Amino acid sequence: MQTALASRGRVGLVPTMGFLHEGHATLIRRARAECDVVVVSIFVNPMQFGPTEDLATYPRDLDRDLALAGAAGADFVFHPEAAAMYPAGFSTRVEVSGVSEPLDGAARPGHFAGVATVVLKLLNIVQPERAYFGEKDWQQLAVVRRLVADLNLRSEIVGVPTVRADEEAAHAGLALSSRNSYLSPEQQRRATVLSRALRAVQAAYAGGERDTGRLRQAGLDVLASEPELALDYLVVVGPDLRDVPQLSDDPLNRVLIAGRLFGVRLIDNMPLSTAPVPAPA
């Protein structure tokens, strides 16, 4: 891989687990606009799945993925086998403490160690100047940024805003996700309760509310309309996912949600402020 990319200019990496959609295409197009060479990795990483999670059934369609990646501007697709990434005797796991521990870190033990390990391997293999991640996985983005900062890696991590279903769609506002394919059209429509709850929290914040308990309640009031939702968490946090009782006016304030709807685990988040988010130091 490094030999193929040598002397080609600025390299951008878009790491994915495949079953690509418009959210991934947005990442690829962003990389295309900013880099000389764009590499898309497709790897369903077994290390980030728990023993009862959907590794075996995670949606896959390589031919479709190759077509979408190429149409969006990818120059190379890196699609390794698990045995190549984790050969016999592989015994290293990368732990990013602190930011990886709450929320999905608590709900999915070992998940972020798997994420950090595979991201570090991909960054070492591809050696990109920039790597592009969706903000829909906000905690994952925070973990990857901490990993890169702590280990003095050369890659810049670029967060790209979440892509949502069009306003004309019955499921308007639903964050695009490969796991949405598990849901029927009607179930996807009902899954918009997550984004509606987040927008209710946004509205309360815009109205001047800074108490995190009352902000959270604004979202819970919306979620109460969906009896099939098993909520993992709805949290209002400051920078670095800090859970505080009272928010300051920080553009990094965020509301995050995760839960199971019709047996499918969904996550989403939104910024609370409409002010521009500063680039990470």
UniProtKB/Swiss-Prot annotation:
Residue numbers binding (R)-pantoate: Q48, Q140
InterPro entries registered for this protein in UniProt: Cyt_trans-like, Pantoate_ligase, Pantoate_ligase_C, Rossmann-like_a/b/a_fold
Binding residues annotated for beta-alanine, in chain numbering: Q48
CDD domains, sorted: PanC (cd00560)
EC numbers, comma separated: 6.3.2.1
GO process terms (BP): pantothenate biosynthetic process
Pathway: Cofactor biosynthesis; (R)-pantothenate biosynthesis; (R)-pantothenate from (R)-pantoate and beta-alanine: step 1/1
Catalytic activity: (R)-pantoate + beta-alanine + ATP = (R)-pantothenate + AMP + diphosphate + H(+)
Binding site for ATP: 17-24, 134-137, 163, 176-179
Keywords, alphabetical: ATP-binding, Cytoplasm, Ligase, Nucleotide-binding, Pantothenate biosynthesis
Entries under Pfam families matching the protein: Pantoate_ligase (PF02569)
GO MF annotation terms: ATP binding; pantoate-beta-alanine ligase activity
Record localization: Cytoplasm
GO CC terms, sorted: cytosol
Gene3D superfamilies named among the record's database cross-references: HUPs (3.40.50.620), Pantoate-beta-alanine ligase, C-terminal domain (3.30.1300.10)
SUPFAM superfamilies reported in the protein's UniProt record: Nucleotidylyl transferase
Record-annotated active site: H24 (proton donor)
EC top class named in words: ligase
Transmembrane residue ranges: none
HAMAP family: PanC
Quaternary state and interactors: Homodimer.
Additional information: The reaction proceeds by a bi uni uni bi ping pong mechanism.
Family: Belongs to the pantothenate synthetase family.
NCBIfam families (UniProt xref): cyt_tran_rel, panC
Function field: Catalyzes the condensation of pantoate with beta-alanine in an ATP-dependent reaction via a pantoyl-adenylate intermediate.
Listed name of the protein: Pantothenate synthetase
Gene expressing this chain: panC
